[in-house]
């Protein structure tokens, strides 16, 4: 039986050595165990899928003891090294233990005797490992021999390799210090960190590192040495950062004792030099000022006390004719762009326009264009809000001619200056529009203008009583050519006083350039009479019969003129009504 059991242990030992070649012998074993684990969340034990034979073995290297459960359910075995941190507690038939990772397990034994025996063996092994660790701590504090190993303990290959690596790094560090003589500032930082590291090393290592420490001091005095990885950290730093660097160097010093320091030499400057431009930027930053964008609106309104809001530039049609001193309109950003350009741009130019002789409280966008452009006559529309625009077909029939004579001032109703026009309304007339029909002579035009002056002023005398006291000025000499499709060109030429041939919402007054006709001006023109708001609404309109009475002399001479004029008149009023409804 003993031979069979001995042969079985040898077979088991050979199987264990396949997993761990440092296993030397089997200390004890038991036939049937099962492993449980404790779940802290559920506060209960959970059975694992590990069960089989328990082996307690000895090893030739640290840790010197361990145990394993060879699982017969699957290929996952339990391997647990035994050290001083392992804690056991016996609860028959369970043996509880907690490892260094604070995981709690429980081993269930089929035989209670095996449970007691394994528990006693584990207690002895943990006590032995505790004594071994205490002895190793005392050996580190006591003087060592030349090879760094004490007489009364076995040789540890891993410890020898670790110490040999430290010796190699120290020698390599000394060689690199001699080969790089121009980096004295970081040497002081590295020496501060190295002294702290040497204090923590065992006394045997201090004896060996003492010559290298003296070597650093000697090379520092003669050549100036430093660690290669510390050199870029000092370039371009101010005094405040230099005071903080010794603490940082002492924290980074243990990382320098790594193998292959020359590989770190190539990689360290890349990470360290990233901080150099930031330090240089920090030193140059007070000399650099933030660029400030100065708009023309801020320069124009620099004398104003209120802070400007968003500046909306005027249209390209307006910009050439605006005076240089006129401030740009300031509107809040919540308004839409189209309403801002048509309604919210209300400003008074600093230089008085030649068309004005009285202060004006406010001007609309269209009236501003009319006053500042001497070669552009606005098309007056009865809609004071400026929302209705003439159509393309109407503009093809009505073309405004440029103003070319001396401009004089004359009182005008405020409602007559409110203009609204499209870009096509401001175009200049062609030279053909100034050519008069050959059938009309100068004498006929004088007679027609005289008769028209007497007829027009009679029905419009009652309108002067409702005149608005606030008046605008109006240019005296205006000319307008009325090309009609399908009819010969008819040019109505009268004086500035008796020039009412059309409704005020359609045309400007037309005058002749003859000085003889200007002398006959005796009464104000109906266009200069300012009608109140109630009369400018679409509800009070001149009927066809009233217009026929006013233009009776033209009806007798040319009946197509009245039809064409009334057609255009109704088109404008219809579109004004549609715009009001919208």
Swiss-Prot record:
Q: What is the effect of changing residue 20 to A?
A: Lowers decapping activity
Q: Which GO terms describe its molecular function?
A: 5'-(N(7)-methylguanosine 5'-triphospho)-[mRNA] hydrolase activity; enzyme activator activity; identical protein binding; kinesin binding; mRNA binding
* Compositional bias of kind Polar residues: 173-196, 522-533
One matching Pfam family: mRNA_decap_C
Instruction: Write out the transmembrane intervals.
Output: none
Q: Where the protein is mainly located, per its record?
A: cytoplasm
Q: What is the effect of changing residue 59 to A?
A: Lowers decapping activity
Which CDD domains does its entry note? Answer: Dcp1 (cd09804)
In the record, biological process GO terms are: deadenylation-dependent decapping of nuclear-transcribed mRNA; deadenylation-independent decapping of nuclear-transcribed mRNA; mRNA methylguanosine-cap decapping; nuclear-transcribed mRNA catabolic process, nonsense-mediated decay; protein localization to cytoplasmic stress granule
Asked if the Swiss-Prot or TrEMBL record annotates the protein with the keyword Methyltransferase, the reply is no
Listed under catalytic activity are: a 5'-end (N(7)-methyl 5'-triphosphoguanosine)-ribonucleoside in mRNA + H2O = N(7)-methyl-GDP + a 5'-end phospho-ribonucleoside in mRNA + 2 H(+)
Keyword line: Cytoplasm, Hydrolase, Methylation, Nonsense-mediated mRNA decay, Nucleus, Phosphoprotein
- Tissue specificity statement from the Swiss-Prot or TrEMBL entry: Detected in heart, brain, placenta, lung, skeletal muscle, liver, kidney and pancreas.
**Which sequence positions carry the modification called Phosphoserine?**
62, 142, 179-180, 315, 319, 334, 353, 422, 522-523, 525
Q: What does this protein do?
A: Necessary for the degradation of mRNAs, both in normal mRNA turnover and in nonsense-mediated mRNA decay. Removes the 7-methyl guanine cap structure from mRNA molecules, yielding a 5'-phosphorylated mRNA fragment and 7m-GDP. Contributes to the transactivation of target genes after stimulation by TGFB1. Essential for embryonic development.
Q: Which PANTHER family match?
A: MRNA-DECAPPING ENZYME 1A, TRANSCRIPTION FACTOR SMIF DECAPPING ENZYME DCP1
Family of this protein: Belongs to the DCP1 family.
- Its name, as the record gives it, is mRNA-decapping enzyme 1A
């Amino acid at each position: 039986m003993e031979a069979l059991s001995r042969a079985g242990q040898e077979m088991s030992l050979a199987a264990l050595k396949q997993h761990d070649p440092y296993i030397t012998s089997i200390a004890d074993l038991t036939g049937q165990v099962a492993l449980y684990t404790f779940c802290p969340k559920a506060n209960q034990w959970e059975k694992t899928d590990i069960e089989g034979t328990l082996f307690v073995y000895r090893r030739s290297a640290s840790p010197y003891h361990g145990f394993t459960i060879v699982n017969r359910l699957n290929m996952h075995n339990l391997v647990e090294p035994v050290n001083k941190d392992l804690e056991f507690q016996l609860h028959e038939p369970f043996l509880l233990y907690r490892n260094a990772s604070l995981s709690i397990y429980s081993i269930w034994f089929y035989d209670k005797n095996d449970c007691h025996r394994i528990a006693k063996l584990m207690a002895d092994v943990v006590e032995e490992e505790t004594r071994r660790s205490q002895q190793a701590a005392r050996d580190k504090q006591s003087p060592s021999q030349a090879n760094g190993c004490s007489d009364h303990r076995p040789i540890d290959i891993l410890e020898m390799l670790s110490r040999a690596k430290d010796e190699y790094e120290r020698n390599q560090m000394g060689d690199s210090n001699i080969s790089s003589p121009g980096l004295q500032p970081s040497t002081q930082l590295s020496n501060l960190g190295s002294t702290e590291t040497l204090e923590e090393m065992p006394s045997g290592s201090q004896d060996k590192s003492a010559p290298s420490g003296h070597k650093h001091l000697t090379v520092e005095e003669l050549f100036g040495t430093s660690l290669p990885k510390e050199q870029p950290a000092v370039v371009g730093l101010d005094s405040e950062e230099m005071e903080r660097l010794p603490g940082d160097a002492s924290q980074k010093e243990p990382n320098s004792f790594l193998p292959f320091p020359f590989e770190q030499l190539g990689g360290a400057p890349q990470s360290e030099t990233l901080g150099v431009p930031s330090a240089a930027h920090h030193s140059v930053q007070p000399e650099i000022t933030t660029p400030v964008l100065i708009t023309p609106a801020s320069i124009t309104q620099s004398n104003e006390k209120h802070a400007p809001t968003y500046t909306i530039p005027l249209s390209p049609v307006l910009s050439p004719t605006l005076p240089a001193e006129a401030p740009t309109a300031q509107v809040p950003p919540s308004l839409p762009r189209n309403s801002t350009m048509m309604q919210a741009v209300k400003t008074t130019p600093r230089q008085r326009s030649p068309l004005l002789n009285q202060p004006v409280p406010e001007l609309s966008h269209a009236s501003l264009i009319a006053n500042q452009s001497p070669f552009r006559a606005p098309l007056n529309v009865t809609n004071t809000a400026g929302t209705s625009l003439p159509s393309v077909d109407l503009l093809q029939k009505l073309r405004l001619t440029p103003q070319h004579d001396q401009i004089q001032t004359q009182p005008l109703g405020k409602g007559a200056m409110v203009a609204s026009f499209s870009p096509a309304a401001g175009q200049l007339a062609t030279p053909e529009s100034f050519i008069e029909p050959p059938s009309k002579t100068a004498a006929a035009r004088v007679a027609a203008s005289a008769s028209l002056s007497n007829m027009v002023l009679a029905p419009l005398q009652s309108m002067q009583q409702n005149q608005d006291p606030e008046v605008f000025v109006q240019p005296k000499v205006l000319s307008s050519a009325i090309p009609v499709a399908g009819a010969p060109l008819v040019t109505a030429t009268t004086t500035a006083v008796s020039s009412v041939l059309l409704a005020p919402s359609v045309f400007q007054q037309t005058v002749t350039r003859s000085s003889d006709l200007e002398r006959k001006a005796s009464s104000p023109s109906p266009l200069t009479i300012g009608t109140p708001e109630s009369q400018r609404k679409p509800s009070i309109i001149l009927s066809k019969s009233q217009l026929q009475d006013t233009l009776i002399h033209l009806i007798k001479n040319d009946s197509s003129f009245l039809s064409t004029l009334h057609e255009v008149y109704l088109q404008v009023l219809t579109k004004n009504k549609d715009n009001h409804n919208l």
